[in-house]
Amino acid sequence: MRHGLLALICWLCCVVAHSEMLNVEQSGLFRAWFVRIAQEQLRQGPSPRWYQQDCAGLVRFAANEALKIHDSKWLKSNGIASQYLPPEMTLTPEQRQLAQNWNQGNGKTGPYVTAINLIQYNSQFIGQDINQALPGDMIFFDQG
């Protein structure tokens, strides 16, 4: 019997309980950088620093790169033109490390998280209406 697809729209929560969360403005800028970096990976081909080239790897890579300082050296090394860029984020050193502290389950955190743990422990459910999705939201499909 064929099961219908259920789209779960989620927003990435790359924070752990002991880390400093991003405020609303920082979250919006993070989202903009996250989308731009992910788009560039699809447009240009994968960066040599995107080691695990699967969907979860793209999320981890884009989140990590979005939290970095996007100076001319970073732009050049990523092959990203300096036009049409989101504004730079002002972050603390702790905030810049958020994507190195994925919730891996069982009270553990680290720089790597599997796809299932990305969904279960590092995403926030928003809804099932695809019309609610914003750039940077992740859509998961449950094929039952």
Model-predicted regions and their roles:
Residues 43, 60-71, 141:
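Sec-exported extracytoplasmic/periplasmic mature domains
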